[in-house]
């Protein structure tokens, strides 16, 4: 999604003469992480195309969005090494993390040391620097939080029940079961809640979800709606009172769903995974809870149910933070300035 924003950005494309090559080998989400002869053949073709286009264009700067670890990193290692062999100036932009989890492996450490040498790096948020600190001097790092297009806030009718929204793929590691357990705690306390899960079924299936909800007697207050997009998705955001995202997903860096929730003036409750603490201001725009902690989730949700004025104030503060830092225009201008700085630094 962020790559498309950059590709389509008038601000960036008017500032530079841009040429784009798609380096993705996966056809869809289910294809990510899988190998095969087809991908090897396509990768070989990609390398030839990169070499050809680089010779033809002679760019001032090559911008690459690599993967942090595993087979996908090994592929991107070859791409960056090819560009280095061609004496190109390179900036890499990370939308994922996990380097620090592999840096003590001899082979990976060797590759990372070679990969990051003489590179400029763009990170999504300040605290993600710890992931690359072993290999990259901070002077070579640029911070560029993501941004999203703005939408109109539509008025909604008051609801009797307090509406909780979870918006993401139905993956266990996104904290689905933790939120379900928190809802069970709140129901036992007699809190009038409605919790809506919106997202594509994944390692949590629809049948499994319904089975758990029925066993915990939550079918009157917990609902799953499957994947929703565009206006249908926006309708859930506009009707919610708070947004809850208790993720412990390894690759979580800078969830755009939090920005979408903040734009709609929703207080956000999430974890300290990845760059999330740089998005949510603790106690001001929402709360950060410990991972795997349904009890903490329930306590924070209950607090916002019992303090509607504070809930509204947090939502307002989140909206203001979104407008100040996380609009697409802010992101595009940050990227433009960073790319200009990178080009200038390589000329020194």
Where are the model-predicted features located?
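Short hydrophobic beta-strand element within catalytic cores of glycosyltransferases
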Residues: 263, 267-270
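A short, well-ordered alpha-helix in the C-terminal region of glycosyltransferases
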Residues: 296, 303, 310-325, 331-334
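Glycosyltransferase donor-sugar binding loop
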Residues: 20-26, 167, 194-208, 226-227
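Nucleotide-activated donor-binding/catalytic signature segment of Leloir-type glycosyltransferases, i.e.
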Residues: 208-228
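Acidic donor-binding loop of glycosyltransferase active sites
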Residues: 238-252, 266
């Amino acid at each position: 999604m962020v790559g498309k924003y950059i590709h389509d950005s008038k601000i960036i494309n008017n500032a530079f003469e841009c040429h784009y090559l798609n380096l993705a080998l996966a056809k869809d989400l289910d294809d990510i992480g899988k190998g095969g002869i087809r991908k090897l053949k396509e990768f070989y073709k990609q390398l030839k195309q990169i070499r050809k286009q680089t010779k033809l264009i002679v760019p001032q700067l090559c911008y690459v969005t690599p993967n942090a670890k595993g087979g996908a990193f090994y592929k991107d290692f070859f791409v960056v090494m090819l560009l280095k062999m061609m004496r190109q100036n390179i900036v890499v932009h990370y939308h994922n993390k996990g380097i620090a989890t592999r840096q003590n492996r001899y082979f990976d450490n060797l590759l990372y040391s070679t990969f990051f040498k003489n590179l400029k790096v763009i990170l999504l948020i300040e605290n993600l620097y710890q992931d690359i600190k072993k290999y990259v001097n901070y002077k070579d790092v640029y911070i560029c939080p993501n941004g999203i297009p703005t939408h109109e806030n539509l008025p909604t009718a008051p609801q009797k029940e307090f509406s909780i929204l979870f918006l993401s793929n139905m993956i266990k590691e996104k904290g689905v079961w933790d939120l379900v357990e928190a809802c069970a705690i709140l129901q036992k306390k007699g809190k009038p809640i409605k919790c809506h899960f919106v997202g594509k079924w994944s390692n949590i299936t629809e049948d499994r979800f319904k089975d758990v909800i029925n066993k915990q007697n939550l079918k009157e207050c917990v609902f799953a709606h499957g994947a929703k997009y565009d206006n249908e998705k926006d309708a859930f955001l506009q009707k919610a009172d708070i947004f809850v995202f208790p993720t412990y997903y390894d690759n979580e860096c800078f969830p755009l769903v939090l920005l979408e929730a903040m734009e709609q003036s929703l207080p956000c409750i999430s974890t300290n995974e990845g760059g999330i603490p740089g998005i949510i201001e603790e106690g001001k725009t929402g709360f950060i809870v410990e991972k795997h902690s349904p009890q903490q989730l329930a306590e924070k949700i209950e607090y916002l149910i019992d303090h509607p004025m504070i809930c509204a104030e947090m939502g307002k503060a989140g909206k203001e933070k979104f407008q100040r830092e996380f609009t697409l225009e802010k992101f595009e201008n940050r990227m433009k300035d960073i790319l200009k700085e990178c080009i200038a630094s390589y000329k020194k």
